[in-house]
Regions:
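Short hydrophobic alpha-helices and adjacent helix-cap/hinge residues
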Residues: 1-134
């Protein structure tokens, strides 16, 4: 795996075009800039057209056709934050509220994309997935 920062769709296309020349790579992990943020389908289409397995930091890319994502489960984290804020509003002193690190990660896998790339997904990986997009 090789991490790649992408600021826009042009960077994404260029990274995917250049990657084969850099030697064997099993997959690319993308950290996408804000200019790409809402272009989920366009990013997933470019990644799929490259035939390179890709992993994203946001589930929306997987729902749009990307292969996989692994990230903090923000819904769960927001709930935990609300519990801590509630304690503050009820008068508990901030120093008495234990600090909580985020612990719940979410792994999402797109089987349709895996099939399109000709990837065999091991059963153990399917069992580890928190969500599978068919």
């Amino acid at each position: 795996m090789r991490p790649v920062f992408v600021a826009d769709l042009g960077d994404l296309k260029e990274a995917l075009r250049l990657e084969p020349a850099r030697g064997p790579t099993a997959a690319l992990v993308f950290n996408l800039g804000s200019d790409v943020g809402g272009s989920f389908e366009a990013v997933a289409d470019v990644a799929l057209a490259s035939r390179m397995p890709t992993m994203f930091e946001h589930r929306a890319f997987v729902d749009a056709g990307g292969l996989a994502s692994y990230r903090l489960n923000w819904d769960r984290q927001t709930q935990r934050n609300a519990v801590q804020i509630d304690k503050l509003f009820r008068g508990e002193r901030p120093g008495k509220i234990p600090f909580e690190l985020p612990t719940l990660q979410e792994f999402v896998l797109n089987l349709k994309t895996a099939r399109a790339l000709g990837l065999a997904v091991p059963r153990t990986l399917l069992l580890r997935a928190d969500a599978v997009v068919e």
